[in-house]
Amino acid sequence: MTHRFPRSRTALAVALMAGFAMSAQARVFRSADVHGDSFPTNMAVKFMGDELSKLTGGKDSIKVFGNSALGSEKDTVDQVRIGAIDMARVNGASFNEIVPESLIPSFPFLFRDVDHFRKAMYGPAGQKILDAFAAKGMIALTFYESGARSIYAKRPVRTPADMKGLKVRVQPSDLMVDEIRAMGGTPTPMPFAEVYTGLKTGLVDAAENNLPSYEETKHFEVAPDYSETQHAMTPEVLVFSKKIWDTLSPQEQAAIRKAAADSVPYYQKLWTAREASAQQAVTKGGANILPAAQVDRAAFVKAMQPLWTKYEKTPQMKQIVDEIEATK
């Protein structure tokens, strides 16, 4: 990601603290998340809050409200846009109907692997996507990687034929709906907090997510077959209310941006460790993981990649996709 900071972090920290020595009253920014306190996203935003406090001499800090305490992801996006809450960590798919550019990281099979994701999304292409949020009332501070999303159900999924007849929970995103339909399933939008009950009661037959989310929510108890389709690498996005942002001093804005950027390496370490522990936990809990090598990736790519053309809504979006593909 292109961060607009001086190269010397120490110099920036000193400059920021000097600016805050004579600044206004202390602020506690409220940040929303649907995950629990021990989930990497929450821990990363808390780390960001600690860094922000250091940079501002204790004047600014962040309080994280997890476990959907401030509402669903859609609810918190709406609240951020109107300034009812200061910030939120939200999965990128929740912005798809608001910020067209946010569709791009959700394109099926766009990223070759995690290394490709990091180089693209923390580079110029990713910054262009983040910049697009401002026109919609949000300052997008950074991405947090979210691993590869895969299908889980009460039976393994090896080919698109195995998806036939499955009602699959999706996020409220036209692209996500079309992805599941292209895979052969029946998409069923549903809030994240309702998925466990939906799977248990048969309201939905399957869902799709990364391993840490699968483990944290205990979805493996009611959908024990996790098939590594790895069809998308939709990132998390950390957004700040532009309405609140515009009331902040340049020093506060710079401190928030720096604290967010500094939280990324911390988050990546947490995420990598959590993926490994989640796989162990769900396997121990009775889940069956079908490895990617046993999934017909070529068949899913053939079925889903035409969606790129449908959702490249502007020449600018196509240019960003081309930049991501060209990233080495």
From Swiss-Prot:
Solute-binding protein that binds D-galacturonate and D-glucuronate (in vitro). Probably part of a tripartite ATP-independent periplasmic (TRAP) transport system that mediates solute transport into the cytoplasm. This is Solute-binding protein Bamb_6123. Beta-D-glucuronate binds at H35, E73, R89, R149, N209, E236. Keywords: Periplasm, Signal, Sugar transport, Transport. GO terms for molecular function: carbohydrate binding. GO terms for cellular component: outer membrane-bounded periplasmic space. PANTHER family: DICARBOXYLATE-BINDING PERIPLASMIC PROTEIN, PTHR33376. Residues 1-26 form the signal peptide. It is found in: Periplasm. GO terms for biological process: transmembrane transport. The lineage of its organism: Bacteria, Pseudomonadati, Pseudomonadota, Betaproteobacteria, Burkholderiales. Pfam families: DctP. The complex is comprised of an extracytoplasmic solute-binding protein and a heteromeric permease formed by two transmembrane proteins. The keyword Transport applies. It comes from Burkholderia ambifaria (strain ATCC BAA-244 / DSM 16087 / CCUG 44356 / LMG 19182 / AMMD) (Burkholderia cepacia (strain AMMD)).
